[in-house]
């Protein structure tokens, strides 16, 4: 599995994955789009701007949009790396949000995606990453713990874990 920035050549694979998330009415943490008004090329440009901190909503922070793929180029999931924390992210969202497409869950992809996402965080000088999950999401909790997460506390149904990035 590889985690990387999406490109134009990934359009079909990513659109198909997005359609699965929508069809299954599944949360897509780590991947942001408006299904009613989506243009892939604009999404790519918005991702580039968000990484540079340009033209983002006032309450957002610069972030890197990444997508995980298998060796054949099949899109597996999303990961969003926030380059700093604001008050909301410190309470609820953390540095990293991620999701694996419904048909590929339970196969270890989330664990590997978070591992690779933490390496990108390290490249961006984030040496201690906050990763959160709902108290109702034992699968995500297991992913975070498998990547070295240390529980700090639980706030309003959100478990907050810190991971030392090595």
Report each predicted region and the residues it spans.
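Conserved beta-strand-loop-alpha-helix junction that forms the acyl-donor binding cleft
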Residues: 131-141
């Amino acid at each position: 599995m590889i985690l990387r920035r999406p490109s134009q050549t990934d359009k079909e694979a990513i659109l198909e994955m997005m359609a699965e998330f929508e069809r299954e009415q599944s949360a897509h943490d780590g991947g942001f789009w408006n299904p009613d008004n989506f243009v892939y090329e604009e999404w790519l440009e918005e991702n580039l701007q968000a990484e540079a901190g340009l033209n983002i909503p006032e309450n957002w922070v610069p972030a890197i949009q990444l997508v995980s793929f298998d060796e054949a180029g099949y899109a597996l999931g999303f990961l969003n790396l926030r380059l700093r924390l604001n008050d909301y992210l410190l309470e609820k969202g953390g540095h990293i949000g991620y999701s694996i497409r419904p048909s590929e869950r339970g196969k270890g992809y989330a664990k590997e995606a978070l591992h690779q996402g933490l390496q990108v965080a390290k490249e961006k000088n984030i040496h201690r990453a906050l990763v959160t999950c709902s108290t109702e999401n034992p699968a995500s909790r297991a992913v975070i713990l498998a990547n070295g997460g240390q529980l700090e506390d639980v706030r309003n149904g959100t478990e907050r874990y810190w991971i030392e990035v090595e």
